[in-house]
């Protein structure tokens, strides 16, 4: 944490510690769940059957309507946490992606994620996955290959990039409803609107 708070004093330092503390707590909880579910470590089959993988940009708010399920993101600990701790922590995975033939001008964020999938380093957990095309076309490029590496049914949610335009609202809502139906079909759980609104 010190690297991210260098030079801070007083209120600014306290706020940074509070914010980073929340991130650390969240990541530790997520890693604990991943380790429990991973067949190579904890092999908790019951937990695994209740996990829905979301990519790092997928709106986790959606899972408020599935109180009996757990959402996890395998990209967050593998790519984002490691690069927060060490800026060159994911360079190897970016190189793997380039060696695969992806141009080097693709954003390093989705390139690193794709590299983890290509190197077969993601834990194989969950009963299904939902991915979205944000934040950029680089994410869209890697999602299909990542989905194959997860070896579970995966839904690709296509978010309109110009999401504030009136002309895309109906389509965007339809995509979210399709994702909900996909999760229902894969898990046997029904979306609970009361739980959803309570969680917001």
What would you call each of these model-derived segments?
Residues 1-200:
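An N-terminal assembly and electron-transfer interface module characteristic of large anaerobic redox
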């Amino acid at each position: 944490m010190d690297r991210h708070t260098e030079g801070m004093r007083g209120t600014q330092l306290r706020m940074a510690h509070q914010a980073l503390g929340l991130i650390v707590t969240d990541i530790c909880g997520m890693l604990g769940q991943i380790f429990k579910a991973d067949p190579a470590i904890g092999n908790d089959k019951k937990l695994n059957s209740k996990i829905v993988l979301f990519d790092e940009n997928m709106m986790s708010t959606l899972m408020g309507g599935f109180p009996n399920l757990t959402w996890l993101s395998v990209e967050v600990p593998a790519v984002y946490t490691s690069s927060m701790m060490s800026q060159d922590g994911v360079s190897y995975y970016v190189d793997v992606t380039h060696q695969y033939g992806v141009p080097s001008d693709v954003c390093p964020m989705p390139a690193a994620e794709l590299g983890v999938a290509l190197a077969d380093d993601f834990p194989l957990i969950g009963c299904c996955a939902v991915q979205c095309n944000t934040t950029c076309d680089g994410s869209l490029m890697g999602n299909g290959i990542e989905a194959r590496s997860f070896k579970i049914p995966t839904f690709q949610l296509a978010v309109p990039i110009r999401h504030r335009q009136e002309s895309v609202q109906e389509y965007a809502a339809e995509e979210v409803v399709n994702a909900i139906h996909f999760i229902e079909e894969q898990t046997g759980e029904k979306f609970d609107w009361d739980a959803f609104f309570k969680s917001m």
